[in-house]
Regions:
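N-terminal [4Fe-4S]-dependent radical SAM core
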Residues: 1-17, 27, 222-294
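Flexible, glycine-rich loop/tail regions that form catalytic "lids" or insertion modules at the edges
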Residues: 12, 20-24, 65-66, 191-194, ...
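Conserved SAM/AdoMet-binding glycine-rich loop
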Residues: 22-24, 38, 52-53, 57-58, ...
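N-terminal pre-triad scaffold of radical SAM enzymes
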Residues: 23-29, 282-309, 342
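Glycine-rich beta-alpha loop elements in corrinoid/cobalamin-binding modules
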Residues: 35, 54-244, 252, 256, ...
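Terminal amphipathic helices with adjacent charged low-complexity linkers/tails
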Residues: 59, 187-233, 246, 255-258, ...
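Flexible glycine/acidic-rich beta-alpha junction loops that bind and position SAM and/or redox cofactors
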Residues: 82-91, 140-142, 172-177, 201-202, ...
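Conserved, mostly hydrophobic/aromatic
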Residues: 164, 266, 301, 326, ...
Length: 599
């Protein structure tokens, strides 16, 4: 059964009041991949009366007044993606398509959706229950932050939205604690993962440079952000406070990561794995095609990539599910209509982080003076892919499962650092769990750019390439590597993109196609460098391409077609046949006669 999204569903349940109303910028997909569904089901499971209003019309009160007011609180999220990232390209152009909207047309989610929905509530309900912000848009904008789309330092989204509370991170436990305290009229000020506004700073909390100071001086903004960045681990983080106008933002320490039992509980909830019928007339939701038959094995990431916001939202400690929980979910997928035997993805932010974590981090918290993976894999991490191998073997043996694909990205450096099970794991994945292509994200080839990204050098990538070719040939399969690249990252110049293009063609035998222009999203170190124009570690000036034309040009340099490469942009990896080389160039499409030069 879906979480109610219509008045008719509320009546059938016999409810006359709701405890919580959740607002989202996406169409409502009931799935463990969708935050509003997880939060809604978490509340339902302990007895709260919950409903969802997906993509309400902000020009009228028709949608927002559908259920009246909640007894406890309104929950507001922009959706699975920051609304400005979902609505705008890196060049600022409006996106026409939307994978999270029924019908696929990007016409339902407003820019700055969290602020728009909070204002919509206040417009139609003057004195109402608390407005609580959550989801990735609120999470990444919880303190003063650089906003790429307006090119200025903005206040916390809590301040701009005039909301009562903000829950950052994944919040499955925080939401229950908040609801219980509000029901009992209790004090919520001690709740982990909570931000709120106060008249005075909180004693014992670290005072950050104010919003006014951060706006006036890039050096103050850098000091503020680095202090925020150092206080993200739940075991070591201090509470933070920051003056914004006449009020203070109080930022409590992060919530603790979920235990394995809690992860199993969350993913064991009774999700329908479908789009709510209220969207039926609008058409399908493309995102469902991927997530319906996929499985989350873990969350969080300690990769430390400077451009990535996963750690700021999910945390840098990996929380993983038990093998039994994952196998149960896989067995359930076989009973769903439309399932044809293939699990489309088994993984998380990084597929091969399942099954191990740094014991020192789990006991004492993450290190503040080093990264787990950069510039090399830390000796304290001790990666072991044994549990991942065992899990994949279990999934292969399930009745009704033809293939369980590992479609999430793989970290070559992490895999190669596991001298016992790393290479056997790669062999198993290539033989059984690749659906034509394996995804990796080297992002660049030039050392000075990789250093700005917090990514390792190309040595592990080239070793991985050789192993991929070897195991592909052994398996007798035709499959290839898909590499993801970033253009216009801080520190990257046109010459670096030209060098990357040569590297991709000569060393990887592929024509780059999966290329994105760097988008400065809030709460990342790369965005800090984009704004200040300095390397935050050395203080030295960096080249930062900020013009739209220059950013587009960097991408064009990389994707320019190379002679000898045809449709698909790759030199295919195929097994030996009839004495011919297994490395063959896919031929270009034949030129139509009408395009040939006249004699």
């Amino acid at each position: 059964m879906f979480i109610p999204a219509t008045a008719d569903e509320i009546r059938k349940l016999g409810w006359t009041k709701l405890d919580v109303i959740l607002i989202t910028g996406d169409s409502y997909i009931d799935s463990p991949f969708v935050g509003v569904s997880v939060i809604g089901r978490r509340l339902l499971a302990v007895g709260y009366r919950v409903a969802i209003i997906p993509q309400p019309d902000i020009a009228s009160g028709r949608d927002i007044t559908r259920f009246g007011e909640p007894e406890l609180f309104w929950g507001v999220t922009g959706g699975c993606i920051d609304s400005l990232v979902a609505n705008r390209t890196a060049s600022g152009k409006r996106r026409r398509k939307d994978d999270f909207t029924a019908g696929g047309i990007n016409n339902r989610r407003p820019d700055r959706a969290v602020i728009a929905y909070a204002n919509l509530i206040r417009r139609h309900f003057k004195e109402t229950a608390p407005v609580v912000l959550g989801g990735i848009e609120a999470s990444l904008r919880r303190i003063a932050h650089y906003d790429f789309w307006s090119n200025r330092i903005r206040r916390s989204i809590l301040t701009d939205a005039k909301a009562d509370f903000l829950l950052y991170g994944m919040a499955e436990n925080s939401i229950l604690h908040l609801a219980a305290n509000l029901r009992e009229n209790g004090d919520v000020s001690e709740l982990r993962g909570l931000c709120y506004a106060a008249a005075t700073p909180r004693p014992g909390f670290l005072e950050l440079p104010s919003w006014e100071e951060s706006t006036a001086d890039p050096a103050a903004f850098e000091k503020m952000f680095l202090a925020f960045h150092r206080n993200q681990d739940s075991r070591t983080a201090r509470g933070l406070c920051q003056k914004q106008d006449s009020r203070w933002l109080i930022h409590n320490p992060p919530a603790h990561p979920l235990t394995q039992a809690e992860m199993d509980e969350v993913h064991g909830m009774d999700f329908v794995r479908a789009v709510h019928p209220c969207h039926q007339s609008a058409g399908g939701v493309r995102a469902l095609e991927t997530i319906r038959f996929s499985i989350v094995t873990h969350r969080g990431c300690y990769g430390g990539c400077h451009f990535c916001a996963i750690a700021a939202h999910e945390g840098q400690t990996v929380s993983m599910r038990s093998e039994a929980s994952i196998v149960r979910e896989a067995a359930c997928l076989t009973s769903l209509s439309g399932f044809k035997g293939r699990i489309l993805d088994v993984g998380g932010p990084t597929a091969n982080m399942y099954g191990f974590e740094c014991k020192k981090k789990l006991q004492r918290g993450a290190c503040t003076n080093r990264s787990c993976l950069y510039p090399a894999v830390c000796k304290n991490l001790r990666p072991d892919h044994g549990l991942l191998i065992a899990l994949l073997r279990k999934l292969r043996k399930l009745p009704g499962i033809k293939q369980a694909v590992v479609a999430s990205g793989i970290r070559p450096d992490l895999l190669l650092a596991d001298r016992k099970n790393g290479i056997p794991c790669l062999r198993e994945i290539i033989r059984h769990h690749v659906s034509g292509q394996m995804k990796i994200a080297p992002e660049h080839s030039e050392q000075k750019v990789l250093r700005c990204m917090g990514k390792p050098g190309t040595q592990s990538l080239l070793s991985f390439r050789d192993l991929f070719r070897k195991f592909t040939e052994e398996a007798g399969k035709e499959q290839f590597l898909t590499c993801y690249w970033i253009a216009a990252h801080p520190g990257c110049e046109q010459a670096d993109m030209e060098a990357l293009r040569r590297f991709a063609v000569r060393e990887l035998a592929l024509q780059p196609e999966q290329v994105q222009i760097f988008t400065p999203t809030p709460s990342t170190l790369s965005t800090l460098m984009y704004y200040t124009g300095r390397d935050f570690r050395t203080g030295k000036r960096l080249f930062v391409e900020k013009t739209a034309a220059g950013r587009e040009l960097q991408k064009k340099i990389l994707v320019a077609k190379t002679p000898g490469f045809g449709y698909g942009g790759r030199i295919r990896q195929t097994p030996k046949r009839e004495g011919k080389s297994w490395e063959k160039t896919r031929m270009s499409k034949r030129i139509p006669r009408k395009n040939l030069p006249k004699r």
